[in-house]
Swiss-Prot record:
Family from the record: Belongs to the 'phage' integrase family.
Stored Gene3D superfamilies: 1.10.150.130, Integrase, DNA-binding domain, Intergrase catalytic core
Annotated active site: R244, K271, H332, R335, H359, Y368 (o-(3'-phospho-dna)-tyrosine intermediate)
Keywords of this entry: DNA integration, DNA recombination, DNA-binding, Viral genome integration, Virus entry into host cell
Stated name of the protein: Prophage integrase IntZ
Entry-linked SUPFAM superfamilies: DNA breaking-rejoining enzymes
Residue span, Core-binding (CB) domain: 103-183
A Pfam cross-reference name: Phage_int_M
Length: 402
């Protein structure tokens, strides 16, 4: 055995011979470079453990440098000193790496997706995949699901929450479902996302408290307890039209054209004291047609106790209180539900949304027009009503960003 330390210069100068030969390194006992007749050079480490000889493959030169080969051989010697076989240890680590690869977050998420997609509409499935690919996979996709902590997920959610709070809540639910799947399939022992809903900022209850569009199914179920069909219809119309509560309460049949599917509100009932044309979705028209059978003999769409008076200002809030939504939802809050869902979708001009709310956007040029963007707003309102129907049917929200 040579007592001369091996050098990179000597390795590079080593020429192939008719038979394989070794270049040993006196600084690292057991380490040698095997030079093959075809010119390839392989690092090997020979050692003895429990009176048996073993040969460990360390790598190919020059991919594995002399310095790196020495480091790896030294690590192996440390294992041997502790009674651990480096070859067996390498096999175990390779098996663990393979297991971690199989339990990579993206792989688990795709398996979860495959089990759920059969019950979803095509559009909803596309939304779920888009959210995963856009917001989740770039951060967590390549990591082993075993190593992902609640802190990791929270950092992802808080970043999303700064620009799209409702989307952050949806991501939390989806990531949580993926971890539930991982628990069921015994890849992890617990779901680190379980308590993160309390870590995100709560929607502030108050004067104009609102709920996201995703929570409408639970609300509609509770609404059935409101008692009065008229009150139920009024609240459903608030949701579908984004009208202010006062605008709906004071609405008269003479302002409604069911054939053209519009409500034309005069300036005197509008906050901005300008007339306002509201396009109606098919679902809103159907509700009004049904309401006409109850109140068509009154001037008001929603009369109060007396036929010549409108519904009282407190009627809707009292109904919400009766069904358990006090400080959770308000009549005015449905306007926030509407604007949040459409703005977050990214599909509609903010001007259309603002005009539908009877706001006058600062960026709109020219004189305010009561019927501005009517065609676009009509299509937008139909999309919104259809999205609510889709959510109620359990098919997800087609307005979610792609």
């Amino acid at each position: 055995m040579s007592k001369t330390p091996l050098t990179a210069k000597a390795i590079d100068a080593a020429q192939p011979q008719d038979k394989p030969y070794k270049l040993t390194d006196s600084l690292t006992p057991g380490l040698f470079l095997l030079v093959h007749p075809n010119g390839s050079k392989y690092w090997r480490f020979r050692y003895w453990l429990n009176k048996r000889e073993f040969l460990q493959a360390i790598g190919v030169y020059p991919l594995i440098t002399l310095k790196e080969a020495r480091r790896r051989a030294t690590e192996s010697r440390s294992l041997i000193a502790n009674g651990i076989n480096p070859v067996e240890q390498a096999r175990k680590e390779k098996a663990i790496d393979a297991l971690n690869m199989a339990a990579g977050f993206k792989k688990v998420a795709e398996d979860w997706f495959a089990t759920r997609v059969g019950g979803w509409s095509e559009s909803y499935a596309k939304q779920v995949r888009s959210a995963l690919e856009k917001d989740v996979y770039p951060v967590l996709g390549k990591r082993s699901i075993v190593d992902i902590t609640a802190r990791d997920v929270l950092a992802l959610l808080q970043k999303k929450e700064r620009t799209a709070p409702e989307q952050a809540r949806k991501l939390r639910r989806r990531i949580g479902e993926i971890f539930k799947f991982a628990v069921i399939t015994e890849l992890v022992t617990r779901n680190p996302v379980a308590d993160l809903d309390t870590a995100l900022k709560a929607r502030r209850p108050g004067h104009n408290a609102w709920i996201p569009i995703s929570e409408i199914p639970a609300f509609y179920k509770a609404l059935e307890r409101a008692g009065s069909v008229q009150i139920q219809t009024a609240i459903r119309l608030l949701i579908l039209t984004a009208l202010r509560t006062a605008e709906l309460r004071l609405c008269r049949w003479e302002w409604i054209n069911l054939e053209d599917a519009t409500i034309t509100l005069p300036a005197e009932v509008m906050k901005a004291r300008r007339p306002h044309v509201v396009p109606l979705s098919r679902q809103a028209v159907e509700l009004l047609q049904d309401q006409f059978t109850r109140s068509g003999y009154s001037a008001f769409v929603f009369p109060g106790r007396f036929m010549d008076k409108p519904l009282s200002a407190s009627a809707i809030l009292k109904a919400l209180e009766r069904i358990g939504y006090k400080s959770i939802a308000t009549g005015h809050g449905w306007r926030t539900t509407f604007s949040t869902a459409l703005n977050e979708s990214g599909r509609y001009s903010p001007d259309w949304i603002e005009i539908q709310l009877a706001h006058v956007p600062k960026g709109i040029r020219g004189v305010y027009n009561q019927a501005a963007y009517l065609k676009q707003r009509r299509a937008m309102m139909q999309d919104y009503a259809d999205a609510i129907d889709s959510i109620l049917a359990g098919n997800g929200n087609p307005l979610e960003p792609e």
